[in-house]
Amino acid sequence: MNRFTYIFSSTIFFVFCAASVQSQILTEIYCGHLLNVESGVWARNALIKVDRNSGKIKEVTNYAKVSSDLSKDNLDLSNQYCLPGLIDMHTHISEDVSGDLIEFYSISQEEQLKIGRKNAHITLMAGFTTVRDVGVYIAWTDKRLRDEIESKITTGPRMKVAGFYLTIPGGGGEVAIPGYEGDVPDHIRVGVARGADAFREKAKQVIEGGADHIKLIASGAVLAYGSLPGSPEMTPEEISAVVEEAKKTGIRVTAHAHGALSIKQAILSGVKSIEHASLIDDEGIELAKKNGVSLTMDVYNGDYINEMGLTDGMPEEFLQKNRETTEIQRANFKKAHQAGVKIVFGTDAGVYPHGQNAKQFSYMTKHGMTNLEAIRAATVIASEVLGMEEEIGRVEEGFFADIIALSNNPLINIKSLEDIHFVIKEGYLY
């Protein structure tokens, strides 16, 4: 995202809600329609049995009739369309929309964490049971939130986190404000480096600190002062050093890269996931397909920025760069999809208000995907890129019982995914 900034007030009311939402463990779920995301076929009258200890599915079978006196750990969704919990592969849950970067100079990690708790709850209730959070300015806020959710202290989606950005001085991952260059506090410059050896050390720091993946800023950014989206920032040598270090432990590396050259350099350096990919060219598309690299193309938020940017306090520089990248990114999304490149669902939540994640589905279908392909991008394909393809993304025996339910068929109307009626994560109904 890298980034205009965020509102740090107006969160206290939600903190209580995020940390104390009541949930109920389920052992049997009766789904009138259950989507097989591989085939696109709806199974009728599916009974999902859940192991209450592991939160995983024991069995998916059929039922003839739903009992009129179900126990409290059974759920009747016989009039609903059920599908796997959704996965957003590009979020910034600890941040809210605003336009004043200077606030990052004084906000504490505790204040940032309060914002994250509120947004985690909102995101889960929108049907997203897993997110890949791809960077925070206040280092390790995301890890603390992840751990609270795992411990059931806080309500939210399953989180995979980056810890902090790896970026060059003054790059797209820096909070650099004209006139305040000398005032940037050290605690929001944890991932700033220059040179292959320095970036290797930063990668070690991310890994040893307990992050799930590494996020590096290979190109300039739309929402950062003086940073040009089409221009490379990290060198191939710097990127390679990070990838080499990551390979030692099997941790995955994803690269923020708008520009065509940056995308190709990142792929050739061994990165397996590209964020944004706005200006990707034909050679980059071919390289991505050949090397099994996934693209996370946030094709919704350009409209939000264009419509609300001034209200949110964004400077004209950011708005201009957004105008220059929005439509070309959508055209390249269509080209990459037609070429058979793996595209995952990722929205850059935090650029727009959290909870609106599902609005991106209709943009993906407008620009070349079928409804089923867009759903697959947010389920089975995303789980593959996360390395969790045997745990999430499908409603099958042995998988976590992550299930959402809605009243209308999303294969007919993709916007149905913007109105989720029930959210179940690891067998818990929220």
Task: Describe the role of every protein-language-model region.
Residues 1-25:
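Bacterial Sec-dependent N-terminal signal peptides
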Residues 27, 34, 38-83:
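Histidine-rich, glycine-flanked metal-binding segment
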Residues 80-147, 151-153, 169-170, 237, ...:
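Metal-associated gating/positioning segment near the N- to mid-region
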Residues 95-112, 172-188, 222-235, 294-326:
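Active-site gating loops and adjacent loop-to-helix segments of metal-dependent hydrolytic enzymes
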Residues 98-101, 142, 225-226, 263-269, ...:
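Histidine/acidic-residue-rich catalytic or RNA/ligand-binding cores of hydrolases
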Residues 106, 248, 317, 324-409:
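His/Asp/Glu-enriched, well-ordered alpha-helical/loop segment
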Residues 116-140, 155-165, 211-222, 252, ...:
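Divalent metal-dependent hydrolysis catalytic cores, especially in the metallo-beta-lactamase
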Residues 144, 198-218, 222-294, 323-343, ...:
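Histidine/acidic residue-rich metal-binding segments in metalloenzymes
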